[in-house]
Amino acid sequence: MFGRAEPELSMIFNEILTDIHRRFGHLLHNLDLVWLDPQAFAEAIFEKGSPLRDCWGFIDGTARPICRPIRNQKIMCSGHKRTHCVKFQSLITPNGLICHLFGPLEGRRHDAFMLHESGLLQELARKMNKANGDPYVIYGDPAYPVRRHILSPFRGAQLTPAEQNFNAAMSAVCTSVEWGYGKIIKYFVFLDFSKNMKVLLQPVGKLYIVAALLVNCHTCLYGSQTTQFFAVDAPELETYLNNC
């Protein structure tokens, strides 16, 4: 193909993958992003029915299936998903972009562990506060603890009607997280082919991170289901990549 041997094509692919990750990977590792406007995002989420006026994004974890490894099978196995996998944590905003991505971690790790290891709590405490000191918050599923900058659904078997309504309203708006994951797999289908995702033989984590970066670029150019739902445009591609 293209006058090149298969091993040579693989080397070229991996070099490009590494270059993209080296040059732009920082765009997914901290919240120092010029396009990040928590007040505008919170208003957009509130207008779609959220009972929270200060919620600007949604956090969730995803487990990407991998081929059963020869080594460390127990570490890579998720008892909840009943498969071998690597896990990522992402934070998605109403303009359809993944603004923070952490991973990969071993499949046995819990979402709360990923949150602690990611350093996101420190980033939120540093960046996401109003002028009067009140916090902007993000919302996640029940796996996440309630903290100053993170909220999750009410838990328990005997919830009040108000608590049930809160959970239902937030569930309706936080589906954008699943749309974000779905778009990555839609455009990079090979990531969903677990038999070819071989830890120690392929850069499985780097593949997913670069795919997320490229999907963000696609959203900047063409929008997404999330941008249409919240009516919030993504930044220009040049603004996103240059972060200025």
Predicted regions and their residues:
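Short, well-ordered secondary-structure "scaffold" segments embedded in the functional core
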Residues: 1-244
